[in-house]
């Protein structure tokens, strides 16, 4: 089972396309949707929703995958649920770069301060990060410098921030999911 966390643009048709592509990794791909506007409520909702999805699956190695803001959530919710995680162009600091787009960006800082201390160290080896060199939204060199001590970084030379085509990385994602 793959739990797919969409990015900030929740209604983008690209989400359906990415989920369709991920079916080459695992036929059971489930959308984990959230409001994108109210982070404090999203955190509790996502924890409950992922827990519910996990009880409805017999997959011994479910995978959380998120793009952009979904990468932020996939990393945290994946860690808290003991899931392997793939982050694609993750937004690591929505409290800084979502000003004017969401109602309470400061809630992301609050969530970060309440998350398990040094959670990346504790999640080391259970995540993988795919970063685009053509990301027009985030400085992925900075993202890589933060995440590289904890997760392998896979660079993509062509995709933009929303990463419409996962095709070049599906084999890597599948191998990561199946790796013990």
UniProtKB/Swiss-Prot annotation:
InterPro entries referenced in this protein's UniProt entry, alphabetically: AB_hydrolase_fold, UPF0227, UPF0227/Esterase_YqiA
Gene3D superfamilies in UniProt: alpha/beta hydrolase
Cysteines joined through disulfide linkages: none
Pfam families: UPF0227
Coiled-coil ranges per UniProt: none
Family stated for the protein in its record: Belongs to the UPF0227 family.
Protein name: UPF0227 protein Shew_1627
Native species: Shewanella loihica (strain ATCC BAA-1088 / PV-4)
